[in-house]
Amino acid sequence: MDKSSGELVTLTPNNNNTVQPVALMRLGVFVPTLKSLKNSKKNTLSRTDATEELTRLSLARAEGFDKVEITGPRLDMDNDFKTWVGIIHSFARHNVIGDKVELPFVEFAKLCGIPSSQSSRRLRERISPSLKRIAGTVISFSRTDEKHTREYITHLVQSAYYDTERDIVQLQADPRLFELYQFDRKVLLQLKAINALKRRESAQALYTFIESLPRDPAPISLARLRARLNLKSPVFSQNQTVRRAMEQLREIGYLDYTEIQRGRTKFFCIHYRRPRLKAPNDESKENPLQPSPAEKVSPEMAEKLALPEKLGITLDDLEKLFKSR
């Protein structure tokens, strides 16, 4: 529902956009490929605490689960994210029988953004590894008390079957997770920006995160954007990656921003977002945010403000702490 008008808005995927669950976009399930050979060969298992977002699912509420964790191989932006887009499109556009959907393999490849001109072998080489990684991503719901533990373990996709000779793909989802595929807090993700950022995975990942934020978002800390990318390089190198990705988002016309500093913490103020990569007819609807001037703080206060970052404590950590009180 559009809060400003009260109008019910239906979000429908097509070739230019996809409906993505906000949780997966904010949590960093899809991240840039680790570029260095050293990092790409080790620590490729990703572990994400999804408690805050996914305990809102009816499965978690009904069973009283209070902890949700997503584990599995790192899912990249260049191939895995596009395959996930194809999966979302498949369930949205085709008849779901029970917990399965079936469609032509060539059509599934198109939904994944792969040109139909590519050979069958190249299609398999791109789709097969991504399906394996996505199907290998585990979502666990659990609750532990002093004496007992209760846990439900499932996968992002339960199974995938394809036969290029028969030209079919069959995808199976956990019925108890259909709500995740059709989460009520969704955004319409324009694929135009993703396509304009080919091979710029860090910019793609930040795009999916920023586009999931509500209208007129608060300033986003540099530390939060680093966390979204989930890189393994030194912090100064990660900062460079974030700034380069933000500049790439500005270059394609998606957003404009100002980087500011409060105390020792860096923030990005987003002035507007344009997922269609062009200005709207009425630019006043963008409600641009003006950057807040840097406040003068005493050396003592500046030292206190810098302490959480030194300890590796993010704004999300502090927010969770205050909510738990």
UniProtKB/Swiss-Prot annotation:
Top-level taxon of origin: Bacteria
GO biological process terms on file: DNA replication initiation; plasmid maintenance
Reported function: This protein is essential for plasmid replication; it is involved in copy control functions. In vitro, binds to the DNA repeat units, BCDD'D'', EFG and HIJ.
Keyword Transcription regulation recorded: no
InterPro entries (alphabetical): Initiator_Rep_WH1 (IPR000525), WH-like_DNA-bd_sf (IPR036388)
Family membership: Belongs to the initiator RepB protein family.
Organism whose genome encodes this protein: Escherichia coli
Keyword Signal: no
Annotated spans, Disordered: 279-300
Signal peptide: none
Record keywords, A-Z: DNA replication, DNA-binding, Plasmid, Plasmid copy control
GO molecular function: DNA binding; DNA-directed DNA polymerase activity
Protein name: RepFIB replication protein A
Transmembrane segments: none
